[in-house]
Amino acid sequence: YLLPVVKNTSWYRIHDVLHGMTAPAFLFSAGFAAFLSFQRKRESYLHFDRRLVVRVRRILFVVAMGYFVHLPYLSLRKTILRTQQGLADPFALDILQCIGTGLLVFTLLALVVRGRETRLALASLLTALLFFTLAPVMAGLHGPWFVEPLFSPVRSLFPLTPWVGFLLLGATAAWLYGQVAPVFFLS
């Protein structure tokens, strides 16, 4: 909506860079908060029990709400009767599905490493690097209409690769903060 002369100014380029940091910072913060929550509730990440089921159900609710807001109609029948292109729209990923999926990945990593903080931070870092590395490859893949939006930046605003990587980097940063904070911030 801005004139090209405005977009060519140096302050606009600075604004554009800062504006581009919003989504990664939001996902990074979600990962940071997830790790802090993990530290407080570590026991609930160790076993397949009621607490874990409640956590996963809450995360799946966030993912479901992300899909719900994309439905073109409130009628499932009308949605199903749309064309193949029309069906892809409800499956496009937005920030809610990205956060939910990232939290599911983080929860799975916590279960696999049995709640050990250092291992969880390392697993989060390596998985984040995997998400970043696979992004160009996954973006070029073509698959079924319901799978393609998971990885295609053309079909989704927030495909899983690379965006979940920012959440996992946030989790790693929270662990790192826990390691260095006592040194720099004496209580």
Name the predicted role of every residue range.
Residues 43-53, 112-120, 178-187:
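Membrane-interface helix-boundary motifs at transmembrane edges
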Residues 2-83, 88-103, 112:
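Membrane helical hairpin/interfacial module
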